[in-house]
Amino acid sequence: MKKIWLALAGLVLAFSASAAQYEDGKQYTTLEKPVAGAPQVLEFFSFFCPHCYQFEEVLHISDNVKKKLPEGVKMTKYHVNFMGGDLGKDLTQAWAVAMALGVEDKVTVPLFEGVQKTQTIRSASDIRDVFINAGIKGEEYDAAWNSFVVKSLVAQQEKAAADVQLRGVPAMFVNGKYQLNPQGMDTSNMDVFVQQYADTVKYLSEKK
């Protein structure tokens, strides 16, 4: 009996220590107004945002977060249109096309690089070329671009940003209640930071 009790006590201590690693106001903040019906894990980004490029291409935050998510928990990525003027809005619509066609993974890197690295994306036509080079037929892209589904996805992205009162990117929210706070994490080591970021998302996704 004593051994069982000690084992249970050890589990409780382990859980308490794990929970104590995460503090509201440190690794995350609780939203003043929770958003009902928000995606379970929601990341906002812009192809114009240098930090978003770093999160995606250097730190691989999205990939690492997905690996840590509990079974059945889905991650959603939305593009914002408050950067880049009219081209930023075109990129939000293009991201809606990518979501509708299920080709996000094919176009993410070339869109980031075309905007920030090679600066070859300067118009809606240039964006279209990226999709075609990624293997999407021009007719398919054009049909999606003008579709009701894509227009709805654009509105959905804009509404989601307004609902959480988004002020900047990259930003990640969990269950419409919590926002990740990278400034409160260990930035002395890249691998440690990425691990802590992904672990915090996992913790919040399981938080009741």
UniProtKB/Swiss-Prot annotation:
Residues 20-150 form the Thioredoxin domain. Keywords: Disulfide bond, Periplasm, Redox-active center, Signal. Disulfide bonds join 49-52. Residues 1-19 form the signal peptide. It holds the Pfam family DSBA. Transmembrane segments: none annotated. GO terms for cellular component: outer membrane-bounded periplasmic space. GO terms for molecular function: protein disulfide isomerase activity; protein-disulfide reductase activity. PROSITE patterns: THIOREDOXIN_1, THIOREDOXIN_2. It is found in: Periplasm. PANTHER family: THIOL:DISULFIDE INTERCHANGE PROTEIN DSBA (PTHR35891:SF2). Required for disulfide bond formation in some periplasmic proteins such as PhoA or OmpA. Acts by transferring its disulfide bond to other proteins and is reduced in the process. DsbA is reoxidized by DsbB. Required for pilus biogenesis. PhoP-regulated transcription is redox-sensitive, being activated when the periplasm becomes more reducing (deletion of dsbA/dsbB, treatment with dithiothreitol). MgrB acts between DsbA/DsbB and PhoP/PhoQ in this pathway. This is Thiol:disulfide interchange protein DsbA. It comes from Escherichia coli (strain K12). The gene is dsbA.
